[in-house]
């Protein structure tokens, strides 16, 4: 009763096609599709790179080097 019927949706689509034209709507759809593909690819690339593991390795190296420096100072 309060919803939009299929006929009302068809009328809205027809008005949009008349206003913008099919060529402009096609290019808009293509641009939108490419944007979504790029976003999905970026999200997949972000998940595949384990940033925490490399961060721990750097911390371990820094801790080892500071311990070596402390031992060298004690020996001197």
UniProtKB/Swiss-Prot annotation:
GO MF annotation list: protein transmembrane transporter activity
Region ranges (Disordered): 43-76
Membrane protein topology class: Single-pass membrane protein
Keywords of this entry: Cell inner membrane, Cell membrane, Membrane, Protein transport, Translocation, Transmembrane, Transmembrane helix, Transport
Function recorded in the entry: Part of the twin-arginine translocation (Tat) system that transports large folded proteins containing a characteristic twin-arginine motif in their signal peptide across membranes. TatA could form the protein-conducting channel of the Tat system.
Record NCBIfam families: PRK01833.1 (NF002500), tatAE (TIGR01411)
Protein name: Sec-independent protein translocase protein TatA
Organism from which the protein derives: Actinobacillus pleuropneumoniae serotype 5b (strain L20)
Gene transcribed to yield this protein: tatA
């Amino acid at each position: 009763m309060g919803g939009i019927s299929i006929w009302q949706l068809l009328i809205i689509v027809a008005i949009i096609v008349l206003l913008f034209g099919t060529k402009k709507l096609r290019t808009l759809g293509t641009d939108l599709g490419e944007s979504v593909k790029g976003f999905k690819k970026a999200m997949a690339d972000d998940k595949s790179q384990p940033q925490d593991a490399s961060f721990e390795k750097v911390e371990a190296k820094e801790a080892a080097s500071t311990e070596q420096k402390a031992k060298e100072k004690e020996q001197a």
